[in-house]
């Protein structure tokens, strides 16, 4: 399941982050890539020892966790290994799959949070390979895309301007993507039913199934 999430960050939060990152120290992105991904990774990222790093990471985590769609669809146990990546002209990240574990946590869901407008750069699309083909994304500033960490994906070459994003990984309470999607569908259905008809016996049955499946699958 690929999920686009609008307005994760407010305009004020975006402006503050971009101001901080504009003067921050960026280093070669290969330093955090796996041994095979280093061959195709060409970007820069906020230095891990940068004074602003911890604060910015906490801001992103808080913004995601307050968003109801993120919580319902992803079922996050923890958000980990956050990076702030910058792609300037000529930079890209070729086909790769994310590591199964990062920082001692399992990577179930990957996300990209866009920090500047798509008009600020050309190229730089995020491409995710699924069974039905390649899906391409270039979202508005403040919006995020979440997708299974098990997929092959890439960032196309930036041909002009600068692409600025926050990327990170989530260990979910429910590791299986199909189970997460089923839980999300049930939750969406019961909320729609409740909005239309209130707390009915049918609503209670769907809620029972949702709760019991989550109880069975959650880790």
UniProtKB/Swiss-Prot annotation:
Kindly list any coiled-coil regions of this protein: none
Going by the record, the broad EC class of this enzyme is oxidoreductase
- Binding residue positions for Fe cation: 96, 98, 153
**Cofactor notes:** Binds 1 Fe(2+) ion per subunit.
**Which EC number(s) are documented for this chain?**
1.14.11.-
Q: Name one GO biological process term.
A: intracellular iron ion homeostasis
In terms of superkingdom, the source organism counts as Bacteria
Domain (Fe2OG dioxygenase) ranges: 78-172
A GO MF label: iron ion binding
Read off the InterPro entries from this record. Oxoglu/Fe-dep_dioxygenase_dom, PKHD_C, PKHD_hydroxylase, Pro_4_hyd_alph, Pro_4_hyd_alph_FE2OG_OXY
What keywords are annotated for this sequence in UniProt?
A: Dioxygenase, Iron, Metal-binding, Oxidoreductase, Vitamin C
Instruction: State its cofactor.
Output: Fe(2+); L-ascorbate
Binding of 2-oxoglutarate, residues? 163
Q: Which PANTHER family match?
A: PKHD-TYPE HYDROXYLASE YBIX (PTHR41536:SF1)
Its recorded name reads PKHD-type hydroxylase AM1_3707
């Amino acid at each position: 399941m690929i999920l686009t999430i609008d307005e994760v960050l407010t305009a004020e939060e975006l402006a503050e982050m971009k101001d901080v990152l504009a003067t921050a120290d960026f280093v070669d992105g290969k330093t955090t890539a796996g041994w095979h991904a280093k061959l195709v990774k060409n970007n820069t990222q906020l230095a891990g020892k940068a004074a602003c790093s911890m604060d910015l990471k906490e801001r992103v985590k808080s913004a995601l966790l307050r968003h109801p769609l993120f919580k319902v669809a992803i079922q996050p146990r923890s958000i980990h290994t956050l990076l702030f990546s910058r792609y300037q002209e000529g930079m890209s990240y070729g086909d790769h799959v994310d590591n199964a574990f990062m920082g001692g946590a399992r990577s179930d869901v990957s996300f990209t949070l866009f920090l500047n407008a798509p008009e600020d750069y050309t190229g730089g699309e995020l491409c995710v390979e699924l069974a039905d083909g390649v899906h391409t994304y270039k979202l508005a500033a403040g919006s995020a895309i979440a997708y299974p960490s098990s997929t092959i994906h890439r960032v196309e070459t930036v041909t002009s301007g600068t692409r600025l994003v926050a990327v990170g990984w989530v260990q979910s309470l429910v590791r299986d993507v199909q189970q997460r999607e089923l839980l999300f569908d049930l939750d969406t259905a019961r909320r729609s039913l409740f909005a239309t008809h209130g707390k009915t016996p049918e609503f209670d049955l769907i809620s029972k199934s949702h709760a019991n499946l989550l109880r069975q699958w959650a880790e």
